[in-house]
Amino acid sequence: MSPTALDACDHHDSFSLPAQDQSKVHPSARRTPEGGLIKVESDSTVYEADGIKAKFTDRGASVIKGSDGKLSVKKTEKNFEFFTKSTVGRVGLMLVGLGGNNGTTVLATNLANKYNISWHTKNGIQQPNYIGSVVRASTVRLGTDPETGKDVFVPISDMLPMVHPNDFVIGGWDISSLSMDKAMLRAKVLEWDLQRQLIPLMENVKPLPSIYYPDFIAANQADRADNLIPGDDKKVHLEHIRADIRRFKADNHLDSVVVLWTANTERYADIIPGVNDTADNLLKAVETSHEEVSPSTIFAMASILEGVPFINGSPQNTFVPGCIELAEKHKAFIGGDDFKSGQTKVKSVLAEFLVNAGIKPLSISSYNHLGNNDGKNLSSQRQFRSKEISKSSVVDDMVAANPILYKTAEDLSKATGEIVKKGEHPDHIVVIKHVPAVGDSKRAIDEYYSELLMGGRNVMNIFNECEDSLLATPLIFDLAILAELLTRVTYRENATGEWQPLYSVLSLLSYMLKAPLVKPGEDVVNSLNRQRNALEQFLKACLGLEHSNDLLLNTRVW
C-alpha cells in the first residue's frame, strides 16, 4: 500500500527531519518562532497552558426602514469569548483526486519545501515556496509602532497556532492507479529538473481506490478509471471510505485529518424530496444506492461521520440539503464550493471596483480555454453546467448592494405590475473550451461593458494567462490549514455560557472559493474585500483585538 495512503512513512515525515536553517528557506515557508510571534498584552486576552482565551465585542448596527422610507439606525454590541487550542498536533491531508494535476502538485510542493529542494530553470536557480497562499504569503496589519507611527504587518500564519504545510501527511484517493511520480509526469505542471529530484520521493506513493459513478463525470474520463472500489453498493462505498480515513489516521499516528475534494467536476445532483432533502433521507438513499447520490457526497458523508472536515474544491452541489443537515447533527465541519483561483477572483474585484465607483456594468462576458484534464472533463455539457453556475453568481451581492444603479425586484415588480423574483443584473455569460495543446496553462478573456455618465459606454478587456494548478495548489493548503485551525476554536456568548464549536458550514473560507457555502437562509458574500476582511477580523477576534481601523484619526484630525 501507499506510504502516504495507509502506511506511516518516516522519510516523508517532517517531524523526523533535521531542523532547517530558516535563513535558507523562502519567507513563505519559514516557521513561526518557538512560542509564537505575537503576544497580546490586554485584560481581554489570557494565555493559558492549552490555549488562548480572548474576549471580543462584535459591534454593528441594526437598521429599520419606516413607512415613510426613512431609516432608523441603532448601534448594537454583542460580547463573545473565544478559546483557541494552541496544540496543532500531527495533521493529515487526504485528497480526493490525489493523482490529478492539483493533487500531484500539492504533494510535490509539500516535498520540495520539506526537503528544501531547489532546481534549475532557464532563469536560474528556483527555490521552493508557498507563493500564492493567503495564509503563508500574505500579511495583515496588526497595529502601529508607537515610536515611528508606521504600520506593523505580520504574516497571517503567525496570527494563531497553525499547521505548517510542510508538516501535512498527505494521502488520498484517485480513480487512476498511476503512482504519484508517473501522475506528476502526466500532469506536466512542474519543471523537469524539479520532477527529476522528486521522483524517488514519489514513486512508491499510490492513491487509494476511489468511487466511480460514470453518470456523474464526463464519459471521456473512463480511460483513467482503473483504480476503483468494486461494486455499485453505495452503502459499502461509504463504509469503505470511512475505514480508509480511520486507517490513514491510525497508521500515520495523526491527531486530525482534513479531507478535500480536488477531483473531477461532477454534474449537478437533482434535489429530490424524500431522497436528499434531509439527513435521514440521504442516509436511506445511500442504503438503497439511489442514482442521485454522487461520489463527492459519499466522501462528504464519510468525512462528516468520521468527524473530520470536508472541503469541496469543485463546483457541483456536493452539499445537498441532507448533507448539510448531517453535518449540523454531527457538529462536523464542511466548506465549499469550487476553488477561486484566477479569472473569478479578478472578476469579483473588478466588478466591485466598478459598482463602488458608481459605474454600471451592463454585461460581463467570460471566455476560457485550457488543456488539462479539468478542461477535458468540462467539455461535457452537464459538467460544464456545474462550473457555469458557480462562475456566474460571483457578482450577485455586489449588484444587489447598489439599488441606485440596479433596480431591485420590488422596483421591477412595481414598474411591470408582475411578480419579479430577481432584480436587475448585468448580462453574464461564461464559455469554457478544451484546447489540449496549452496543457495546464489556462487562458481567460473577459469583457466588461459598462454604462457611464450621460449614457456613455465603456469597454474593458482583460487577458489572463496562468498555470491552473499552480494557482489552485496554494488554495488547497490554505483551506486545509484554516479548516484545521477552526476545529480548535470554540466560543461562548457570555463569560458563564457553555463553550461551543463553530457552526458546521465554514463560510470563513469564502475567500478561496467561487461559490461560497453559507448557513442555509443566509446571504452569500462574494465581495473579495469583505471575504478577506472577515477572515482577518476573525483571527484578530481570537486574539481579543479590534479589527483594523483605517480611519487614522491621528493623521487626519490632529
Swiss-Prot record:
Record GO biological process: inositol biosynthetic process; phospholipid biosynthetic process
Pfam families reported for this sequence: Inos-1-P_synth (PF01658), NAD_binding_5 (PF07994)
EC number: 5.5.1.4
Compartment list: Cytoplasm
Subunit text: Homotetramer.
Functional description taken from the UniProt entry: Key enzyme in myo-inositol biosynthesis pathway that catalyzes the conversion of glucose 6-phosphate to 1-myo-inositol 1-phosphate in a NAD-dependent manner. Rate-limiting enzyme in the synthesis of all inositol-containing compounds.
Name of the protein in question: Inositol-3-phosphate synthase
One GO term describing the cellular component: cytoplasm
Keyword Ribonucleoprotein: no
Catalytically driven reaction(s): D-glucose 6-phosphate = 1D-myo-inositol 3-phosphate
Membership in a protein family: Belongs to the myo-inositol 1-phosphate synthase family.
Cofactor: NAD(+)
Segments for region (Disordered): 1-34
Gene3D superfamilies the record matches: NAD(P)-binding Rossmann-like Domain (3.40.50.720)
Molecular functions (GO terms): inositol-3-phosphate synthase activity
UniProt keyword terms in alphabetical order: Cytoplasm, Inositol biosynthesis, Isomerase, Lipid biosynthesis, Lipid metabolism, NAD, Phospholipid biosynthesis, Phospholipid metabolism
Deleted gene: phenotype: Inositol auxotrophy. Increases the RNA level of genes involved in inositol sensing and metabolism. Simultaneous disruption of ITR1 or ITR1A lowers hyphal density and leads to a severe sporulation defect and attenuated virulence in a murine inhalation model of systemic infection.
